[in-house]
Amino acid sequence: MTQLPRRGVCLVISAPSGAGKSTIANALRASEPTLRHSVSVTTRSPRPGEVEGVHYHFRDIAEFRRMAADGELLEWAEVFGRGYGTPRAPVEEALDAGHDMVFDIDWQGHRLLRAALPDDVVSLFVLPPSLEELERRLNKRASDHPEEIARRMKAALDEISHWSEFDHTIINSDLDTAISQARSVLTAARLATRRQRNLLDMVASFSR
């Protein structure tokens, strides 16, 4: 089978907290070992078991803001008093080498990432089947206190209001189905004509 070289896909998955974006993104990474993960920069403290450079790049707020000011971050935001951002260099290097990447970020990150990489981003928004189900899922998280859940529910409504900015939308009422749908989005993105290098030369050779 002929495989032409192509530019990588930047798959962005966004959703309100509890809708399943991280679970879906992790399932894609587990099923496709070649799928690259962007290691974000954050100003929050490491949680037990988290490793620098594997889960996050942990930086203080001054360094984080310097990176943002110097253009070293493709996108960044301060959420709940914590800074999160995507380093520019490793992403651009991976895409140019033909490696696909998946990001689980919020709508603001998606907007900034699309502005920075307009030809590379393919985006997917994950909706919960209902707000009641979303609240139930958040309540199952033992680490979140009632005040935190209330704050996340308020933030969820804001996140959901931006669903129409995304290329694709799925409803996560069944996780296996949602993962399969996300994989279909990635497969279609890989086949985009604009992403396949040397395709023009290959087709031109048919008439020789």
From Swiss-Prot:
Pfam name, any one: Guanylate_kin
Superkingdom of source: Bacteria
Listed PROSITE patterns: GUANYLATE_KINASE_1, GUANYLATE_KINASE_2
Gene Ontology molecular function terms on file: ATP binding; guanylate kinase activity
Assigned keywords, A-Z: ATP-binding, Cytoplasm, Kinase, Nucleotide-binding, Transferase
Enzyme class: transferase
InterPro entries noted in UniProt: GK/Ca_channel_bsu, Guanylate_kin-like_dom, Guanylate_kinase, Guanylate_kinase_CS, P-loop_NTPase
Domain Guanylate kinase-like: 8-187
Sequence positions that bind ATP: 15-22
Location relative to the cell: Cytoplasm
Gene3D superfamilies: Guanylate Kinase phosphate binding domain, P-loop containing nucleotide triphosphate hydrolases
Main location: cytoplasm
Residue ranges the record marks as coiled coil: none
GO cellular component, one term: cytosol
Catalytic activity: GMP + ATP = GDP + ADP
EC assignment: 2.7.4.8
UniProt family annotation: Belongs to the guanylate kinase family.
HAMAP family reported in the protein's UniProt record: Guanylate_kinase (MF_00328)
NCBIfam families, A to Z: guanyl_kin (TIGR03263)
Function recorded in the entry: Essential for recycling GMP and indirectly, cGMP.
Protein name: Guanylate kinase
Provenance organism: Gluconobacter oxydans (strain 621H)
Gene: gmk
